[in-house]
Design a protein with these regions (language model features):
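Terminal regions of secretory-pathway proteins
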Residues: 1-138, 142-143, 161-486
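Active-site nucleophile-adjacent alpha helix/oxyanion-hole segment immediately C-terminal to the catalytic cysteine
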Residues: 153-162
């Protein structure tokens, strides 16, 4: 998108670049704070499932098995091994004719029944020797995205049942339309500030002519500014852990405790254990639940509440400081991996991208590394970007960190669907005019450039249940609730 800009440098040689980026990465990771029930000052007003819906979308549109963290890379030489379109190839794979082991006729095969949440027909993914038989193996990398993949299998299967005269391809198109509709009309407005999205519309409709920075010749491509920086916003939304259901042992860390590796965690690439079915109302607002009481382990409402994503900010939770060896290594810090990848791929600084967009860049004083909580405490350090690594980042912030820090400046008070919640809403940082514009233009461009997408075939289309159809309705439909979809 901005390939004519000069790559950002953070030192005179490779060793200094890595050392300085490592210093920044250390400041971007919060102190240890284990998973807990109850409200949390780091929560946004975005239900937790949107973090993993974003991951599901990422697996639909991107796959890069070849770029390196040990040498400089030419971004033009990278290949996206996924189609850069929201076409659900991570769900459908190559279809029932080419991958019949995933299908039973034109419906998906489902896995073993799951227990623990009282959810009818909850099931694991179909597996062979523990490995999931699905369109993209990455959608089994943690328990949440794995169960969402299984839910999407059920969404397709119910669509088949409700439309028994349709062919596989016709059902597939309807599933894609609903998924794309949610991505455009629910997911994007959750993570991108309304002022950014408004600039991409004409008379309330997204307008291809408003795409100012994302242009393709024949087919849409995957810009590194999106895949390596802007769309890595989800890493800051991850909580230290999540409660799957009521059971005492189902408040789980995202990774195993290195001091107690046998303890349950949300690690994937294995069959679901007993009692691990997700109560979806803890992840998306299927119903109205109590908000809970902060720092009160005795309050029974805290175990049943809807969990919310952490705020989009320049801070990651402590478990992401050192990823398990089976996930990543050298480096094991997720923040450093992101920063190094952006540098080795030659990304410009956030300030340079802002100027190229004809925007006034954030000042160094506005680029705060740390949690965007309302009232920072002793455990919430707020570090100005210019004070890190002897000022090497002054006026020269890595694009990923810049985009996360920018969100702090674009907060919206979100009213959340919970009894007892703050009447004024929850302050929720959203992607601003640099990060949000990159994400929104790539989403829209991928759809405008795909001749089979909802924006290309029928931009006025809405689900039969109404224009308010959202992720919660997609989940409810997959669970067998609500009216049929056609």
């Amino acid at each position: 998108m901005f390939r004519t800009l000069t790559p950002a440098k953070f030192g005179p040689n490779d060793a200094d670049n890595v050392a300085n980026l490592s210093a920044l990465a250390d400041k971007m990771v919060a102190d240890f704070d284990g998973p807990k029930d109850g409200p949390d000052a780091e929560e946004s007003g975005i239900p937790a499932l949107y973090t993993y819906f974003g991951q599901f979308i990422d697996h639909d549109i991107t796959f890069d098995p070849v770029s390196s963290l040990t040498k400089q890379q030419d971004p033009d030489g990278l290949v996206d091994f996924r189609t850069p379109s929201l076409d659900l190839d991570n769900l459908y794979g190559r279809g029932p004719n080419d991958q019949p082991y995933m299908y039973d006729g034109i419906k998906f095969r489902l896995g073993e029944k799951l227990t623990g949440a009282g959810v009818p027909d909850a099931s694991d993914l179909p597996r062979f020797k523990g490995r999931a038989l699905i369109g993209d193996p990455r959608n089994d990398e943690n328990s949440i995205v794995s169960q969402f993949q299984a839910l999407m299998l059920r969404f397709h299967n119910r669509m088949v049942d409700d439309n028994d005269s349709l062919s596989f391809e016709e059902v597939q198109q309807r599933v894609r339309f609903h998924y794309q509709y949610v991505a455009l009309n629910d997911f994007l407005p959750r993570i991108v500030h309304a002022s950014v999205l408004d600039e991409l519309r004409t008379a309330g409709q997204y307008d291809r002519s408003k795409l100012a920075h994302y242009h393709w010749k024949t087919y849409p491509f995957m810009p590194v500014e999106f895949s390596v920086a802007a769309y890595r916003l989800g890493h800051s939304m991850i909580r230290p852990g999540y409660r799957l259901n009521d059971a005492d042992n189902m408040l789980l860390q995202i990774f195993p405790d290195p001091h107690n590796p046998d303890k349950n965690a949300l690690t994937g690439f294995r069959a679901m254990g007993p009692g691990r079915a997700m109560d979806w109302g803890r992840f998306i607002d299927l119903d109205t639940r109590p908000y809970g009481v902060e720092d009160d382990d005795t309050n029974p409402d805290n175990k049943k509440r809807l969990q919310f994503a952490y705020r989009i900010d320049a801070s990651l939770v402590d478990p992401l400081r050192k990823l398990p060896p089976e996930v990543a290594s050298n480096p094991s810090s997720l923040a450093l991996r992101n920063l190094e990848r952006g540098w080795r791929l030659g990304l410009p600084s956030g300030q340079a991208v802002a100027k190229a967009m004809n925007l006034a860049p954030l000042t160094d004083d506005q680029i705060i590394i740390g949690k965007a909580v309302d009232e920072p405490g002793a455990g919430d350090p707020q570090t100005g970007i210019a004070t890190i690594a002897n000022g090497v980042f002054a006026g020269n912030c890595p694009l990923w960190a810049y985009i996360l820090a920018e969100a702090r400046q674009f907060q919206t008070a979100v009213t959340i669907p919970a009894t007892g919640a703050p009447a004024t809403g929850i302050n929720t940082p959203q992607l601003g005019p640099v990060g949000g514009r990159i994400v929104a233009e790539v989403f829209l461009g991928m759809m405008f450039g795909d001749n089979s997408s909802v924006l290309s075939l029928d931009p006025q289309w809405t689900p039969v249940t109404g224009s308010s159809f959202a992720l919660k309705d997609l989940v409810a439909y997959a669970l067998g609730q609500g009216d049929p979809l056609h």
